[in-house]
Amino acid sequence: MSSQPRKILVTSALPYANGSIHLGHLLEHIQTDIWTRFQRMCGHEIYSVCADDAHGTPVMLKAQELGITPEEMVARTREEHHQDLLDFFVEYDNYHVTHSDENKELSELIYNRLNDAGYISKRTISQLFDPEKNMFLPDRFVKGTCPSCGAEDQNGDSCDNCGATYDPTEMKNPRSVVSGATPILKDSEHFFFDLPQFSDMLQNWLKSDALQSEISNKLEEWFEKGLQQWDISRDAPYFGFEIPGAPNKFFYVWVDAPVGYMASFKNLCDRSGINFDEYWGADSDAELYHFIGKDITYFHCLFWPAMLEGAGFRKPTGVNVHGFVTVNGAKMSKSKGTFIKGRTYLEHLNPEYLRYYFASKLGANVTDIDLNFEDFAQKVNSDLVGKVVNIASRCASFITKRFDGKLSDNVLEPALVAEFQHAQASIAQAFEERQYHKAIREIMALADKANQFIDANAPWVTIKDESKQAFTHDVCSLGINLFRLLMVYLKPVVPKLAEQAEAFLNDDLSWSSAQSVLTGHEINKFKALMQRVDMDKVNAMVDDSKENLAPTVTLDPNSPLAKDPISDTIEFDDFAKIDLRIAKIVVAEHVEKADKLLRLELDLGGETRQVFAGIKSAYQPEDLVGKLTVMVANLAPRKMRFGMSEGMVLAAGPGGKDLWIMEPHEGAQPGMKVK
């Protein structure tokens, strides 16, 4: 790691202005803030900027829904986002918004330079159009049936069921999410950026140290398919910046969103006298880093550097990509209460719990981070409270009560102090490389050694022996110094705790101060620095995050529920009469002269039943043997011309090939009752 002062500009991806900050956002902002604070502690000149991403159809429609202008909604949301981040101790030098004069000026400048250089072209394309709302529909505002697998209610550009990607015009039974109307095809002239012209430059850039290897490898797929021209325009009505010289044509949000990094920094420069070109000019020797999530990689690693190159600006030094946040091993869920907004978290828990936990799991790769609440409580309570803060609380009272609040002039074990100080280099390297989990692991190993030292010397015992007062003073003073070193290393992660420690220690914690020891130094009276995580508060947070999603669901007229509505309500006693059991299919065979039936022999775990099931159109008999399914076991036997049917297997679907028998999860056994 360089010891020379560096000039660095850091950005985080811009939160979109139509929703609240949640834990997924916070992973990235905390990751960025830790790195920024570390660099600043090391004495480097670093600026961090962010902004709200304000443009696009979703913002326009949300504002209409609220009965306010998009500008009003964006201003309100930006204030909310910024305050949430501040309350998690995420401090940007500037937090701006993309609907700004600076962003309009820079977006037009970049576009005009690209256009003058011949990188912009126009052509007519056909798009889905909502005839009721009189607007073209972005991909996310079209739903329909997947053209690949036939799954219904899929997004306009990709299928959650089979993973296929496609053009919205390829969907079957498309409908507008805005009005529910069936969209029509309509022609419109669009503007395109000639991305293929930058193919060689981008491939060379991908091979540099700017990206993690897994990201570079993934992006190679784009070159294997061949880069395509990028549609950079959208038609009115649209909330955004109008393209110069093109009435009712607007920049696509992903054109001006990354320009928002430049605009936020320019806003800071104009207020603070910083030289903008020293950081964004083509010959800049400053470092520029973007922290982003893996879902927006291709915008930042293909389109954005090509735009910068074509417009005569510098490219990023590095794009640091992280994974998603899962909660308790699963995708965040509003119904389960694990889609947790930042403000809801703050109403229940200390923000530094989350900062520390994320740091303990964050590396420089793109792996998803799981927030397991039991592990979260155990790690924070064990590490921060039980190890680090405990060192100070075990030693401080003796210093205050017996030694007038002054540390000893003597350093009892210089070798132990030297070990703590020597670790600074490897901890710094881990922070520099964004291997926060390695830094935390090493810091906690040192905390263990500090506690072992205190345990071995037991000041609570020696304080009772008048002949060992000086020794006790030395032990507790060294304990306080070890705590101080740990807090220097943890300061980028838990800045508020470090601030409280500074007040207690009566000392400023800088990265360089780790090479000194406090002797004969007066400290202040110790106050509790951090409370343990209370699982009752965690559970209350989850409960407060649960949402009843039923009111937000709109019925798709082509959905199974619309075609086959729910039957009349029955009493529980009626349902309780049905005996559902797990059954194993041991025999499956065709029934001669039957068009729809298969004959099944079902093992109920001690009893075998014969059932004729109308699933021949969907299954080959050999594919069913060995499967577990669910059957109605107490249905009266029914005599058929092929034999006696002694029950019924359960299946879902409209019929034909679209039938699926019920299959229980692994662990179910034949004969088990389904309740």
UniProtKB/Swiss-Prot annotation:
GO biological process, one term: methionyl-tRNA aminoacylation
Record: residues binding Zn(2+): 146, 149, 159, 162
One of the Pfam families matching this protein, by short name: tRNA_bind
Organism, as annotated: Pseudoalteromonas atlantica (strain T6c / ATCC BAA-1087)
GO terms under cellular component: cytosol
Chain location of the short sequence motif 'KMSKS' region per the record: 331-335
Function: Is required not only for elongation of protein synthesis but also for the initiation of all mRNA translation through initiator tRNA(fMet) aminoacylation.
NCBIfam families, alphabetized: metG (TIGR00398), metG_C_term (TIGR00399), PRK00133.1 (NF001100)
Signal peptide: none
Cofactor requirements of the protein: Zn(2+)
Compartments it resides in: Cytoplasm
Protein's recorded name: Methionine--tRNA ligase
InterPro entries assigned to the protein according to its UniProt record, in alphabetical order: aa-tRNA-synth_I_CS (IPR001412), Anticodon_Met (IPR041872), Met-tRNA-synth_bsu_C (IPR004495), Met-tRNA_ligase_1 (IPR023458), Met-tRNA_synth (IPR014758), Methionyl/Leucyl_tRNA_Synth (IPR015413), MetRS_core (IPR033911), MetRS_Zn (IPR029038)
Taxonomic superkingdom: Bacteria
The UniProt record lists the keyword ATP-binding: yes
